[in-house]
């Protein structure tokens, strides 16, 4: 196994660990889930570039008769990238004392101000940071509002 193969294995393991954490561990942390709301995806340009570059590497490895293990590892990396960028849906997970947004735990007492923009984006002002929450379904904003009002 070459250094390239080891690096590919490390990236695959890291992406797999992230996917397992995001799907199975994070919803079980910090108590029961009160509400999980799907969010809009951000631009997919980065993901297309990543998967495209991996496809170019696969093509280059196959045409130059590279090691088969490298080809399989590149295919696994492409599949993990496809899953994380296109299959997995980002979401905000509300718990009893806070919520997970972008895989970061934020307690409710850190929210200093909340606003709703004209285009349906919920803006939460924290101490030093502003969260822009773009929900997939506009009706979910009312569910979030009811949950936040009932928990305060």
UniProtKB/Swiss-Prot annotation:
Q: Which InterPro entries match?
A: DUF986
Specify the protein's topology with respect to the membrane: Multi-pass membrane protein
| UniProt xrefs under Pfam families | DUF986
Where it sits in the cell: the answer is:
Cell inner membrane
- Report the domain of life of the source organism: Bacteria
Identify one Gene Ontology CC term for this UniProt entry. plasma membrane
User: Which NCBIfam families does the record associate with it?
Assistant: PRK02913.1 (NF002791)
Q: Tell me the organism.
A: Citrobacter koseri (strain ATCC BAA-895 / CDC 4225-83 / SGSC4696)
Q: What is this protein's name?
A: UPF0266 membrane protein CKO_01158
Similarity comment: family membership: Belongs to the UPF0266 family.
Q: Which UniProt keywords apply?
A: Cell inner membrane, Cell membrane, Membrane, Transmembrane, Transmembrane helix
Transmembrane annotation, as ranges: 6-26, 45-65, 67-87
């Amino acid at each position: 196994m070459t250094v390239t193969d080891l690096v590919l294995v490390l990236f695959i393991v890291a992406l797999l660990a992230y996917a397992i954490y995001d799907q199975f561990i994070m919803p079980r942390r910090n108590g029961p889930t009160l509400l999980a709301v799907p969010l809009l995806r951000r631009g997919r340009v980065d993901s297309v570039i990543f998967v495209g570059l991996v496809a170019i590497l696969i093509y280059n490895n196959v045409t130059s008769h590279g090691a088969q293990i490298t080809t399989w590892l590149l295919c696994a990396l492409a599949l993990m990238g496809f899953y994380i960028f296109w299959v997995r849906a980002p979401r905000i997970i509300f718990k009893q004392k806070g919520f997970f947004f972008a895989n970061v735990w934020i307690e409710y007492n850190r929210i200093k101000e909340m606003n709703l923009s004209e285009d349906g984006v919920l803006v939460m002002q924290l101490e030093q940071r502003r969260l822009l929450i773009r929900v997939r379904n506009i009706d979910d904003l009312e569910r979030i509002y009811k949950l936040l009002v009932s928990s305060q």
